[in-house]
C-alpha cells in the first residue's frame, strides 16, 4: 500500500506550543519517565509497529514518544472525533511520527484516520494500542488478512474491554489482548480521580454554570460515576444516582446519594451526566420532562447514551452557542443544553484528565505492550491482565512525586503475613 500523507493534523504551526505543553506534562508523568529510564537503552519494543487509536492529547503525546524511545515504530489516530488537542497532534507530527487526528473530524474522516495507521514503511502493523475497540474491530472485520501478523492488543477503556470479552465469547477475537482498564492503577485512578476533576472542567468551560445548589443526575455508579458524583457533590450540588446493579446502587445509597430511575430523576435534575457505557440512557420522554435549560452531557466512551437523534428530529430550534455547546428549543418551550454532541464532555469541552493520573494509565499501556511483544508465548488468544507486581510497580513510580513515604515490612512481619517483603502485597482477588 503506497503511503500518501506523512501526517494530517489541523495546523502544523501549533507544534511549538504543543512541545511546550509536552515538556510541562512530562514533569507530571513520572511513570512514563520511569519507563524511559528503565528501557530506553535496551529498547524492548524494537521491531514493534504499533498502531494506536487513543485520544490525541498532550498526555498521549508523551505516551507516543515513550513508545518510540523504547524502540517502537508508531502510527496514531484519535479514538474520538472531538478529543484531539491540535497542538499536541502538531508536536507529534513535527517530531516525525505519523499522526492522523484533528479536533472536529467527521465520521468518515475518523475512519480514514484509523486506516492510515495500518501500514508502515516496513509492513503492516504488528501491535495494537486501542481505546474503545474501534481499531480492533476494524482490523477484525475489514482487514482480517492482517490479524495473523499482530502479536497483541492492549485496551485502555471499559467499553473496549467489554467489546473484547464479547468478541472472545463469540469466537471472533483472533489476537491476544491485555485488559489495561482493569489494572487497579488504571480503573481506580483514571476512571475515578480523573473524572472527578475533568468532568467539572468540561461543564464549566462549556457553560460557566454555578453548580452549587443545583440538582445533578449521574447515570451509573461505577468508577467513573463515583468520581463524577464526588465532584458534583464537592461543588455543592445535590446528586441523584441511577443504577441497574444492586451492589452499585447500595454503595451509592450508603454514600448518602438518592438512587432512583431516570424516569423520576429527569423531572428534578438541572445537570445530567451519563457514565454507563450503555445505550438509551436519556431518551425523548426524558427530555420532554426536563427543566428549562437542563444541561445534558456524557462521559462514557461512545455517543450512544443520549438520544441526540431525537433532539435533532424533534426540537423546534437548535442554536449553536459555541463549539460543542448546542441549545435545543423543545415544543413545550423548554430548552436543553447539550454538550459535545453527546460525546465525551471532558475531552470535547475541556482538556481531559490531568497528566498525573494519565501517567498511571499509560504506564500500564507501555508495560502491556512490552509484555505482549516480548513474551508472546505467555499470552494465548484471549483477554489477560497485567501481573499484580507490575500494578504495584506503576503505583510505586508515582509516590515520590507526591512525597509519599512507604512503610517497609520487617522480615518478621512478612513471615507472619506469608508474603515477600517486596510484594505483591495483595492477592489477585483483592478489590481495593
Curated annotation (Swiss-Prot):
GO terms for biological process: one-carbon metabolic process; S-adenosylmethionine cycle. Its EC number is 3.13.2.1. It is found in: Cytoplasm; Melanosome; Nucleus; Endoplasmic reticulum. It catalyses: S-adenosyl-L-homocysteine + H2O = L-homocysteine + adenosine. The modification Phosphoserine is found at residue 183. Pfam families: AdoHcyase, AdoHcyase_NAD. It is an enzyme of class 3 (hydrolase). Its main location: cytoplasm. One of its GO terms (molecular function) is NAD binding. The modification Phosphotyrosine is found at residue 193. Keywords: Acetylation, Copper, Cytoplasm, Endoplasmic reticulum, Hydrolase, Hydroxylation, NAD, Nucleus, One-carbon metabolism, Phosphoprotein. Pathway: Amino-acid biosynthesis; L-homocysteine biosynthesis; L-homocysteine from S-adenosyl-L-homocysteine: step 1/1. Its cofactor is NAD(+). Substrate binds at residues 57, 131, 156, 186, 190. The modification N6-(2-hydroxyisobutyryl)lysine is found at residue 186. One of its GO terms (cellular component) is cytosol. Residues 183-350 are annotated as: NAD binding. The keyword Chloroplast does not apply. Catalyzes the hydrolysis of S-adenosyl-L-homocysteine to form adenosine and homocysteine. Binds copper ions. Homotetramer. Interaction with AHCYL1. This is Adenosylhomocysteinase. It comes from Sus scrofa. The gene is AHCY.
Amino acid at each position: 500500500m503506497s503511503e500518501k500523507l506523512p501526517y494530517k493534523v489541523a495546523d502544523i504551526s501549533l507544534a511549538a506550543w504543543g512541545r511546550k505543553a509536552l515538556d510541562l506534562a512530562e514533569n507530571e508523568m513520572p511513570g512514563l519517565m520511569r519507563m524511559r529510564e528503565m528501557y530506553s537503552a535496551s529498547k524492548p519494543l524494537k521491531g514493534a509497529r504499533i498502531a494506536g487509536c487513543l485520544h490525541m492529547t498532550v498526555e498521549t503525546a508523551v505516551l507516543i514518544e515513550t513508545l518510540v524511545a523504547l524502540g517502537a515504530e508508531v502510527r496514531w489516530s484519535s479514538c474520538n472525533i472531538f478529543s484531539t488537542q491540535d497542538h499536541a497532534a502538531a508536536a507529534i507530527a513535527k517530531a516525525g511520527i505519523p499522526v492522523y487526528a484533528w479536533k472536529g473530524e467527521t465520521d468518515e474522516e475518523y475512519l480514514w484516520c484509523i486506516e492510515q495507521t495500518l501500514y508502515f514503511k516496513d509492513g503492516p502493523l504488528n501491535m495494537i494500542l486501542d481505546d474503545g475497540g474501534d481499531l480492533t474491530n476494524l482490523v477484525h472485520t475489514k482487514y482480517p488478512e492482517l490479524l495473523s501478523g499482530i502479536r497483541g492488543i492492549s485496551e485502555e477503556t471499559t467499553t473496549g474491554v467489554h467489546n473484547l470479552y464479547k468478541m472472545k465469547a463469540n469466537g471472533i477475537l483472533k489476537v491476544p489482548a491485555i485488559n489495561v482498564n482493569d489494572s487497579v492503577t488504571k480503573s481506580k485512578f483514571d476512571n475515578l480521580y480523573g473524572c472527578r476533576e475533568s468532568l467539572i472542567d468540561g461543564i464549566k468551560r462549556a457553560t460557566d454554570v454555578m453548580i452549587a445548589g443545583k440538582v445533578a443526575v449521574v447515570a451509573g455508579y461505577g468508577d467513573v460515576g463515583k468520581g463524577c458524583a464526588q465532584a458534583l457533590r464537592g461543588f455543592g450540588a445535590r446528586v441523584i444516582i441511577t443504577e441497574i446493579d444492586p451492589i452499585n446502587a447500595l454503595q451509592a445509597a450508603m454514600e448518602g446519594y438518592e438512587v432512583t430511575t431516570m424516569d423520576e430523576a429527569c423531572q428534578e435534575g438541572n445537570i445530567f451526566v451519563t457514565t454507563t457505557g450503555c445505550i438509551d440512557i436519556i431518551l425523548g420522554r426524558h427530555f420532554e420532562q426536563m427543566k428549562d435549560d437542563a444541561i445534558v452531557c456524557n462521559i462514557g466512551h461512545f455517543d450512544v447514551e443520549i438520544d441526540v437523534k431525537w433532539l435533532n428530529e424533534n426540537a423546534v430550534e437548535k442554536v449553536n452557542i459555541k463549539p460543542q455547546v448546542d441549545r435545543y428549543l423543545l415544543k413545550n418551550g423548554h430548552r436543553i443544553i447539550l454538550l459535545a454532541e453527546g460525546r465525551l464532555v471532558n475531552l470535547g469541552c475541556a482538556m481531559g484528565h490531568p497528566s498525573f493520573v494519565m501517567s498511571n494509565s499509560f504506564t500500564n499501556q507501555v508495560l502491556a505492550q512490552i509484555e505482549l511483544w516480548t513474551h508472546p508465548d505467555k499470552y494465548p488468544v484471549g483477554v489477560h491482565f497485567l501481573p499484580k507486581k507490575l500494578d504495584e510497580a506503576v503505583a510505586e513510580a508515582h509516590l515520590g512525586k507526591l512525597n509519599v513515604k512507604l512503610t517497609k515490612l520487617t522480615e518478621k512481619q512478612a513471615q507472619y503475613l506469608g508474603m515477600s517483603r517486596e510484594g505483591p502485597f495483595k492477592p489477585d482477588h483483592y478489590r481495593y
